[in-house]
Swiss-Prot record:
Pfam families: Ribonuclease_P. GO terms for cellular component: ribonuclease P complex. Belongs to the RnpA family. It comes from the Bacteria. This is Ribonuclease P protein component. The lineage of its organism: Bacteria, Pseudomonadati, Pseudomonadota, Alphaproteobacteria, Rickettsiales. Consists of a catalytic RNA component (M1 or rnpB) and a protein subunit. Disulfide bonds: none annotated. RNaseP catalyzes the removal of the 5'-leader sequence from pre-tRNA to produce the mature 5'-terminus. It can also cleave other RNA substrates such as 4.5S RNA. The protein component plays an auxiliary but essential role in vivo by binding to the 5'-leader sequence and broadening the substrate specificity of the ribozyme.
């Protein structure tokens, strides 16, 4: 399972435009599947973009901790499930840094599974 980060503003805008948004208590997830401009001839399965604002916390140490937690959550979820050709942007909200890891894992996996298995 290969995970890489979104590199430029155009990729972020493309995912925001074509992706589906899930608003959870601790984060906003924008997720899209099979976007050809990014996935064309790529060995990577998952493209991840993380937007951590200074409004969330002024200290860079805390913002970096949030990014590390998000990357670890994505690795756990992707190793447990068979996700392919997926691009997502995660925007954490207030309380993300103090939230329990198991709660974050449950919410994120629920949002990703809702994307793959939409309710009718």
């Amino acid at each position: 399972m290969f995970i890489t980060s979104l590199k430029n503003q155009k990729e972020f805008e493309l995912i925001n435009k074509l992706g589906k948004k899930f608003h959870e208590k601790y984060f906003i997830l924008v997720i899209a599947k099979n976007i050809p401009k990014i996935f064309l001839e790529s060995k990577y399965n998952i493209f991840l973009g993380i937007k951590v604002s200074k409004k969330l916390n002024k200290k860079a140490v805390v913002r970096n901790k949030i990014k590390r937690r998000i990357k670890h959550l994505i690795r756990l979820i992707c190793n447990n499930s068979n996700l392919k050709k997926l691009a997502m942007i995660i925007i954490p909200r207030k309380g993300f840094d103090t939230a329990d890891f198991s709660v974050l894992n449950h919410e994120l996996s629920k949002a990703i599974l809702d994307f793959y298995n939409p309710k009718k």
